[in-house]
Every structure is written in C-alpha cells, then in structure tokens.
Amino acid sequence: MKNWACMIHSVKFIGILDTNVIYPIEIRDILFWFAHYDLFTPKWSKHIFEEWERVMIRKGITQVEAKKRSNIANQAFPDAFVENYENLIPNIELPDKDDKHVLAAAIKTNANVIVTNNLKDFPQDYLAKFSISAKSADDFIADIIDLNNEKAIMAFRELVMNRRNPNLDEYQVLDNLRKNGLTNSANYLHSLL
C-alpha cells in the first residue's frame, strides 16, 4: 500500500470522488474547496458524473440544471476528468458490479484513494492489489485537516464566505456537515476555529 499519509496534503495525492460524496452538496462543497486549496487532486469519470446527474434529477433538479452543475465542476477542475478506463472494467471484481467503473477510473489515473461512503463495496484487501485504498468522506476530510490545519481552515472559511442560498455562518455550516455524516470532520474544524 502507498504511504499516502505523507502525500495527502499535496496536489500529487489523487482521490477519486464517488457519486455519493459529490451529492449531497455539503460534502461536495468541502471536498471541492479543499481541492481548490491544493490539499488533494480530485478525479472523476463520465460514469460518476452521469450517475450524479441522475441523482440530481431524482431529487427534483432539472436535466438542464444537472448538466450545468456537472459542466461547472469540470470547468473548475479541468484535469479531474478521467478517460479511457472502460477497458479495465470487465477484469475488476467487486461485490457490486455497478461500482467497477469507479475502481477502473482510480486505476487509470493512479489514484491513491477512492473517497466513498459505500465502503462495503470496495474491499480494502482487493483495492490493495492496485495500491489504492477506500475512505469515507468523513475520514478522508478529517485526514486532510489533520495534515494541514492552516490550509484546511482557510478553505473552510472561504467555503462559508461563498455560501449562498441560504447564507450560513461557520457554525451553521458545521451543523450541516454533521447532518451529512461528516461528524468527525466538523468537530475537528470546530476545534480549530
């Protein structure tokens, strides 16, 4: 397994973002702001974004708006889009065949970690064959905070300042993070404020 703990605070540290950490917005926002502050390099694929768009549509967002949001993410992180991974999918063995594309994209881009809240479908022993691990969004974000408190707080504060509709203060944003399963991360950030 790669010694990713020493690399995580670097843009060289690559994390594939599974759909379930791109939606809901509270998790996506903090991940995107941490990436903006070069705390890690985000990656995703066409399959992941198509799934994200379907989730948004199921949640009542129009197809046009869903496509607009995915395009904005691709424009904000133009190097995040992983291509030419499809040929790896048939050879991957995971408990849920619908998750094979996530690991294929991770392998293709030499990712260090798959950030997912669906850990049961990404067995660590199997991922280790590819020098990849899987972490929940909460564990991944808490690790980033731990390795670079100063930049993480700067990113968090900018997230709060840019938050619209509704405008929320730091503590309200932290409460939203907790409600979305980022309890450890929110508590860690809270302790640094």
Language model segments and positions:
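Metal-dependent nucleic-acid phosphoesterase active-site entry motif
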Residues: 1-29
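Acidic, metal-coordinating catalytic cores used for nucleic-acid/nucleotide bond scission
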Residues: 21-22, 90-98, 120-123
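Conserved beta-strand segments of alpha/beta enzyme cores
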Residues: 41, 81, 131-133
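Extended, non-globular alpha-helical segments
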Residues: 50, 54-77, 147-155, 162-163
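Acidic, metal-binding active-site segment of PIN/NYN-like and related structure-specific nucleases
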Residues: 99-133
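Acidic, PIN/NYN-like endoribonuclease modules and their adjacent C-terminal/linker elements
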Residues: 120-193
